[in-house]
A protein has these predicted regions:
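Sec-dependent N-terminal signal peptides
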Residues: 5-14
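Sec/Tat signal peptide C-region and signal peptidase I cleavage site
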Residues: 15-21
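Immediate post-signal-peptide N-terminus of mature secreted/exported proteins
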Residues: 21-61
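C-terminal amphipathic alpha-helix
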Residues: 35, 109-143
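Secondary-structure edge/capping motif, primarily at the C-terminal ends of alpha-helices
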Residues: 49-63, 92, 115-125, 141
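Alpha-helical segments in soluble extracytoplasmic regions
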Residues: 49-88
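Short, charged, amphipathic alpha-helical segments
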Residues: 65-72, 101-105, 127-133
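Short, solvent-exposed, charged loop/turn and helix-capping segments
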Residues: 81-101
């Protein structure tokens, strides 16, 4: 029994390290770092969309390989943004007692939807909308 409990504790500790801000809660927060990271992820998404457009239609193996890698990169960075919103802001930083609660929820939702749209297509307008949503959310959050 103790062995199973120790194994479970170790697994959960490892899982927590891999998948999100600690959720202890540790009280160590870096809001500006999270916004910087989301904007960096958005820039990567925008670059990926451009590269996907450039590589589409090419038939050589290298282009096919690069195309699939850029698609995966776009998906990954959009998911990272959604994870930051869900696991950092929504669960730890946005409080229902805040006067800005509704505006913050709307802003967080807009970021998550914009990231989802980036996953669904390759229109650079979606990447631009994502950047605007992040900046708008940051503006409300930092007021």
């Amino acid at each position: 029994m103790i062995h199973k409990l120790a194994t479970l504790t170790l697994f959960l500790s490892f899982f927590n390290i891999l998948f999100g801000h600690c959720q202890v809660p540790c009280g160590v927060y870096g809001d500006s770092a999270r916004f910087t990271q989301m904007l960096e992820d958005q820039s990567t998404i925008a670059k990926a969309i451009g590269q996907i457009s450039e590589l589409t239609g090419k038939e050589d193996a290298q282009s096919a390989n690069q195309l699939s890698r850029w698609v995966a990169t776009k998906e990954d960075h959009a998911s990272k943004i959604q994870k930051i919103i869900a696991e950092y802001f929504l669960t730890q930083r946005i409080k229902s007692s805040s006067d800005k609660y509704d505006a913050l929820l709307k802003g967080a939702h807009a970021v998550m939807v914009a990231a989802m749209k980036c996953k669904q297509g390759v229109d650079v307008k979606n990447a631009d909308s994502l950047k605007s949503a992040i900046e708008s959310f940051q503006s409300v959050y930092e007021k």
